[in-house]
């Protein structure tokens, strides 16, 4: 059977194509999958029908990307497990967390003046109707889709997008030059172990070749003092740039070579280093700027984005901490990804679009 995807409202990334028909297992669509309760508010309940649909939509998106590479058993294959959970378990957990977040965000819309207008509702309804009409009854049954579930899915996606924007807008956007300050250097990295041959394949240096590489690197370091770029060209060394600030991670944590950063910190603009020893390599660097204005502005944007993301996470975590969340594990265990979705032929992959920003 074939599913046609549609672009509507936000993130309806249903890369759905064909799959074998076996129905929805034993899912009881009217059973309650998730219950969220608090002392001062009515309980929030999410049905198995909706939760199953949300999970199968996620499955379809993953299948369209990964199934052809990793095989039909990739959902439960322990080779792809992480933190003791296979992919099916991990994605099902993610679906639950997403549903919980979206339902709680819906309850707090008034806190941030967020609304879903009648025009939005009409666009959602139209997109859902198009999706339902584009796909066969058998296909819709397999994914657990109904007009109600598709509308609800798109509605909650829209709520989540607008609430995230509204919450993020309250983050502190004041970032000083001192906090964001970036230094920038250019560098040549000279490997002492491997090189790429003319055919593009990686080869390993012999002991004699390594001796030559080291001698060339030493000569290049001396010449670079007067002509950094010319030396790089002469020895066919690539020149790259790197910007960093006071929050630069250590090399062990994924940052740049510690010895290089230490050298850069001791240099003034225009100064060229000698050979700096790294892990199986040498570096030669030139400090280009002690305060890179462009890089600093980009860093400010990054800091603000991180603050916004953290604030959103803190707010949604707070919503969850304020309620008691119960998942019917027996019902949820029935949802599985045994059948693999495959992408439809290009001619059958049409879109019906609706937007609500």
In which residue ranges do the predicted regions lie?
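C-terminal motif of bacterial Sec signal peptides marking the signal peptidase cleavage site
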Residues: 19-23
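FKBP-type peptidyl-prolyl cis-trans isomerase
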Residues: 30-69, 103-109, 114, 158-167, ...
């Amino acid at each position: 059977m074939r599913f046609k995807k549609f672009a509507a409202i936000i993130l309806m990334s249903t890369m759905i194509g064909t799959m074998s028909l076996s129905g929805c297992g034993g899912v009881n669509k009217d059973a309650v999958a998730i219950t969220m309760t608090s002392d001062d508010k009515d309980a929030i309940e999410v049905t198995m029908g909706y939760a199953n649909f949300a999970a199968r939509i996620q499955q379809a998106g993953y299948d369209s990307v990964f199934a052809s590479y990793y095989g039909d058993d990739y959902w439960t294959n322990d080779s792809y497990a992480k933190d003791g959970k296979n992919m099916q378990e991990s994605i099902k957990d993610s679906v639950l967390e997403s549903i919980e977040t979206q339902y709680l965000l819906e309850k707090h819309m008034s806190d941030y003046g967020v609304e879903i207008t009648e025009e939005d509702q009409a666009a959602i309804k139209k997109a859902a109707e198009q999706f339902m009409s584009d796909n066969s009854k058998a296909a819709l049954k397999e994914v657990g889709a109904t007009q109600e579930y598709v509308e609800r899915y798109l509605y909650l996606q829209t709520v989540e997008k607008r609430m995230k924007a509204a919450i993020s807008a309250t983050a502190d956007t004041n970032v000083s030059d001192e906090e964001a300050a970036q230094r920038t250097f250019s560098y040549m990295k000279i490997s002492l172990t491997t090189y790429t041959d003319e055919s593009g394949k990686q080869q390993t240096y012999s002991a004699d070749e390594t001796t030559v590489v080291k001698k060339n690197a030493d000569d290049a370091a001396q010449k670079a003092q007067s002509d950094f770029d010319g030396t790089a060209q002469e020895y066919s060394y690539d020149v790259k740039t790197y910007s960093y600030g006071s929050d630069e991670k250590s090399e062990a944590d994924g940052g740049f070579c510690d010895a290089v950063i230490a050298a850069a910190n001791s240099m003034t603009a225009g100064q060229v280093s000698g050979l700096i020893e790294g892990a199986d390599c040498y570096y030669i660097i030139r400090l280009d700027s002690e305060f890179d204005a462009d890089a600093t502005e980009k860093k400010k944007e990054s800091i603000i984005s991180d603050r916004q993301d953290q604030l959103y996470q803190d707010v949604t975590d707070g919503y969850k901490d304020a309620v008691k969340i119960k998942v019917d594990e027996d019902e949820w265990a029935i949802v599985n990804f045994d059948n693999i979705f495959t992408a439809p032929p290009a001619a059958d992959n049409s879109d019906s679009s609706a937007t609500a920003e």
